[in-house]
Amino acid sequence: MPLSSPVSRALRHTRAIHIDAFARDDGLWDLDARITDVKVKDVTLASGVRPGGVFLHDLSLRITINRELTIVDAEAASDAVPYPGYCDTIGPAYKRLIGLNLMKGFRLGVKERLSGVLGCTHLTELANILPTAAIQAYANDVIKTRDGNGDDQLPDRPFQIDKCHALRADGPGVAKYYPRWVAALVNE
């Protein structure tokens, strides 16, 4: 269902987030993430006037992960920033993502390593959305998914159960799509 029709309004700012996922020839996987901010009108900053339509932020983050979804490499680039010579020096800090696992304590690890003055607000928020992008990208390749038809005899329950309201273990979504796992929960 789409959003309701808005009242009369004027665009002031556009933030775009884009993530591409790649399977590499060496067996690793890359997530390339980019965040951009553009103002419609000129904006006066401490560093000078940024004309409308020109990037205020154009920031990129690439992480390389293995099949266990552990980050084995990371890099960041700041191609447009409000404080040139300052904002764009933080890129090397994002190597601190190496060793974190996207499925186990990732957001807490990001906070500990890159929050506040340890990182860039926008690159760090970009990092925080990578786990769900990885799940979408690698379902059936790295993360095993199931069709829920009840014929699946694997001993572990599907990872997506209890990860959102639609697939809560005691709900109608799991009863319909993963009936074996609702029954297993009730009988335990």
Task: Name the predicted role of every residue range.
Residues 4-48:
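N-terminal intrinsically disordered, cationic/polar leader segments
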Residues 37-188:
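Active-site- and interface-proximal helix/loop "cap" or "latch" segments in soluble metabolic
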